[in-house]
Amino acid sequence: MVIASVGFSTNLARLLDTPADEYSPHTGKELVARKVRLLSAMAGHLSDPNFREFNVAQDVPSAQKVFAEWPIEVVVSPFELGVSAKYPWDRFEQDLSWAEKHPVIESCMAYHQRECDQNTFDLTSVLYAVDGPSCFTVSGPGRFEINDEGISVFTPCEKGNARYLLADEATYPAIIDCFSSLLSCPAGQH
């Protein structure tokens, strides 16, 4: 099982705190260690030491808990990746044209009030969960930590369970091509 986390860490922190019960003799943390092979999380900002990324800042204690106690591999897709790998609006709209009124297009228009290229914050995390490292460079191992102000820090460490995604101008087109191939296929036809 792979978990793609694209929001606050609240539910994942609660999962770690879940005791054994009538449904399983294992705690939540034990179940994660036994059943999950990867947590792919959109979280943090690694290049600006003062940036409080939204998903982390909304529930700092839960983010701290998840990244400190998660028992298996975590791959983080940081803010700067999603803001740099923009999905061009015309292609985004074309890829979702299989639906007469696609809810994603409608919600983007309602939010932005205009056509605009889309950040891929959450999409990069999901793409890694679905497709692995094919479009990305993955950092070496380390620890991904959240301080009390909600600032994220990655510290390289051979025994760390965290890594983060990297990409650059040369690889952004491949990332967008991957999104396009997934989004342009009507629901249920993958």
Residue positions per predicted region:
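N-terminal acidic, glycine/proline-rich low-complexity segments
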Residues: M1-H190
